[in-house]
Amino acid sequence: MQKQIFFSFVLVMMLLGKVKAQHNNPFGNALIPDMIADASIQEINGVFYCYATTDGYGQGLKTSGPPVVWKSKDFVHWSFDGTYFPSAAKEKYWAPSKAIFANGKYYIYPTINGYMYPAVADKPEGPFKLARGKDEFYKPFTPSTLLQSKNPGGIDAEIFVDDDGQAYVFWGRRHVAKLNEDMITVDSVVQVISTPRKEYSEGPIFFKRKGIYYYLYTIGGDEKYQYAYVMSRVSPMGPFEAPEQDIISTTNYERGIFGPGHGCVFHLEGTDNYYFAYLEFGRRSTNRQTYVNQLKFNEDGTIRPVELTMDGVGALKKVKSDKKIKIDTVYASSIEVPLKIEPMKDPTCLRTEYFVPSFAVDGANGSRWMSAAEDSINPWIVADLGTVKK
């Protein structure tokens, strides 16, 4: 009898362990409740804007989602309203950069069908249109490209405006050039930034803090994505020097964070609080999400390696919000089978995503409920609020 009780106890504990495993969320609390990458985040007139590549369309680099800008007043609650670049809505749209205010207009520099284009609008939420020529796209390219080249020439534009008003454009493979005053043409002198690490690089980040210019560049890719940096005390075009500890983000095996790559650095206006946004390997290929952690500096101005987490940084501003209602139970018409995510370069990157109903209301943007494939006509989900409370 005691053996039977012991066996039953072990069986129950095994089942409880299985249930617990099924509720594991390997993707934590992403910034946005969507699959986005290559984020450029900025604060404009007290509102946070997040321009990014929309992922999750299941065809790798062959396609992308439409141009969408997410907005938030507190950095926690995000929303969007349609597409901000109508003519580019059906194109392959990547890495739109920050919106730069100049000449009474807002400019962005997305990579569209493999080419960088300047686009312009009256407001940061658009609608944007090509800054020169007809506002239309055709392949292989439209002659309104930033670099005015028949060859793709570069991707992932990053715009920096120095204190004297001079604008610079950085792009993949360590390139930099001055932008002319019209903000849509590039100075003929193009430089390649010398860095100690020579691997393929994209997703540049550039900013200035306390008189020091920082150039961040990616190396590797997929689960092996990393960010390294060099710094200059002279100008945005160098000369640059590499600190002894030049890697600021890399895979954190203990926390299950793989390939922290193309993102941005931003800071709160009027403060010295800096933040590092990065994409994470996610669900393999172009099915990524974006996370944000604090960026900290040493006394000599060098950057400390980022303490990567998937917890988020919480609210960056206080705004009045609705009272949260506690949910007692959540159940649904069906649950999609778990998704096993296979690694690409790192065999230790083994993940399983579950789609249980409770994930719809857990407050984490990295989890979700999905109905079973055969339940696609009229799926439903119910949140039980429990007994009536006054």
Describe the residue ranges of each PLM region.
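Conserved structural scaffold segments of CAZyme catalytic domains across common CAZy folds
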Residues: 21-29, 362, 375-377
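N-terminal non-cleavable signal-anchor helices
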Residues: 11-13, 20, 45, 357, ...
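Disordered, acidic Ser/Thr/Pro-rich linker "stalks" and the adjacent N-terminal cap
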Residues: 314-389
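Signature of short aromatic-glycine-proline-rich micro-motifs recurring in repeat-based ectodomains
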Residues: 97-98, 259-265
